[in-house]
């Protein structure tokens, strides 16, 4: 390796905030199912603390050995609706508490997988789990929840969409003392993936190995600095620059994943190529788009800039790593991105523009605060719109929205840490009540029939 490449890597880490956002251990709980809920919970706790006992220590050892910051160590598990569904329990909050206790015991930041997959319909376990989400998130610290309400193959389960509007509303009310923090740990998906290392949407799919390591990289600051060097150049050059930068970022992710996998004796799964921002200055996806020539993110041209960024990151990342997966795109969470927050405050960025950007990026309406009096039906309709974009375009989309109790447009909602600060954004005041009340399923699109 040439000296200038070594110096470049050091600069990327020290000055441009390059880091590994997360090492996530996926753990299958299929062998923990039991007709007795208490027995199942004991098995779950035992398996998690056994498998993940050294996860944090290994992460810290890799940090000091390679000098690469690893921000989060996390766990994802098999959707609890599947595991708890075999028990006779009529409420699953105790399962959430078990996950929380296991996460605290091994020292991870978050544990994901308090989840249900209801894109086509409900099982008994799904019904109980979804009903228990508000209490589960109110009574735990580190548990994250997700529900998949649609897929390109099956269409959109509008009964689930309607219920999730109510669940989000109830979760916000139950966690009102922390400005609706519970909602920041709840994601509603269409086309959810089984190997996502990022929270709050991570769960360990049933098609996955017993235990696996997935890595999420992050480097918005590095990409912005690279684009600064090609100011005024045509888009071909910009795309090539982003591609080469993404290659370097992903190589580091692969290295960390492989080393962690060897040290833990667990198979290496995937690197997720998503560019994930933080509230820190110089770690913003919005600022990358602005560096391409936009006065402020949200103006005309924003969606095109995001398309170029997302595609170039994937092209560079795929070349750098044998197995990529997860969500693999750009994240645009409003509260976690200094540039997004500023654009909302200046009136340049609104919900409708964010929805358009969703057609390109990984998640969509992410970490968005809306007024506390937003109705459950309006929240459900927002979910339906996002799910439709995902289902029709055969991609993952999601909603993580916080109707913080007692807030109005222009207020600021403080979550702290990586979750940041969200300005409360206006929603369309016209009603979607009759639309959401219909229920049923929106059929799968015609182009989903590929067999």
Curated annotation (Swiss-Prot):
CDD domains: RNR_PFL_like_DUF711. InterPro entries: UPF0210. Gene3D superfamilies: 3.20.70.20. Homodimer. Belongs to the UPF0210 family. NCBIfam families: PRK05313.1 (NF003700). This is UPF0210 protein Lm4b_00560. It comes from Listeria monocytogenes serotype 4b (strain CLIP80459).
């Amino acid at each position: 390796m040439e000296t200038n490449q070594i110096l470049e890597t050091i600069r990327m880490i020290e000055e441009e905030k390059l880091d590994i956002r997360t090492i996530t251990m996926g753990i299958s709980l299929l062998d923990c199912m039991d007709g007795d809920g208490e027995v199942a919970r004991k098995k779950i706790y035992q398996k998690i603390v056994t498998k993940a006992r050294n996860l944090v220590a290994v992460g810290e050892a890799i940090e000091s050995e390679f000098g690469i910051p690893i921000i989060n160590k996390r766990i994802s598990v098999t959707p609890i609706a599947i595991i708890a569904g075999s028990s006779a329990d009529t409420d699953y909050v105790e399962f959430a508490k078990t996950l929380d206790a296991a996460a605290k015991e091994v020292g991870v930041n978050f544990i994901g997988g308090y989840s249900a997959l209801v894109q086509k319909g409900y099982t008994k376990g799904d019904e109980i789990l979804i009903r228990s989400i508000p209490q589960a998130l109110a009574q735990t610290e580190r548990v994250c929840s997700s529900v998949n309400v649609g897929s390109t193959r099956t269409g959109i389960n509008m009964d689930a969409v309607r219920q999730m509007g109510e669940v989000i509303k109830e979760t916000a009310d139950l966690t009102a003392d922390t400005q609706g923090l519970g909602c920041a740990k709840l994601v509603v998906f269409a086309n959810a993936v089984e190997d996502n290392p990022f929270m709050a949407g991570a769960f360990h799919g049933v098609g996955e190995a017993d235990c696996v390591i997935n890595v999420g990289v992050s480097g918005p600051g590095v990409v912005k600095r690279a684009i600064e060097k090609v100011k005024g150049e045509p888009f071909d050059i910009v795309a090539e620059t982003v591609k080469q930068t993404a290659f370097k970022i992903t190589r580091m992710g692969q290295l960390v994943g492989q080393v962690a996998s060897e040290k833990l004796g667990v198979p290496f799964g995937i690197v997720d190529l998503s560019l994930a921002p933080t509230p820190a200055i110089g770690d913003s996806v919005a600022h990358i788009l602005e560096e391409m020539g936009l006065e402020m993110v949200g103006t005309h041209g924003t969606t095109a800039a995001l398309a170029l960024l997302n595609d170039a990151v994937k092209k560079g990342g795929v070349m750098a790593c044998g197995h990529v997966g997860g969500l693999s795109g750009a994240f645009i969470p409003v509260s976690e991105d200094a540039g997004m927050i500023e654009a909302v405050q200046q009136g340049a960025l609104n919900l409708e523009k964010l929805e358009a950007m969703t057609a390109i990026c990984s998640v969509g309406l992410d970490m968005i605060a809306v007024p506390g009096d937003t109705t459950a039906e309006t929240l459900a309709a927002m979910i339906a719109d996002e799910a439709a974009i995902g289902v029709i375009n055969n991609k993952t989309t999601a909603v993580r929205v916080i109707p913080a109790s007692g807030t109005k447009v222009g207020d600021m909602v403080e979550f702290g840490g990586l979750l940041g600060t969200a300005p409360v954004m206006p929603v369309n005041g016209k009603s979607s009540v009759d639309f959401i009340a219909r229920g049923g399923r929106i059929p799968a699109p015609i182009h989903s029939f590929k067999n």
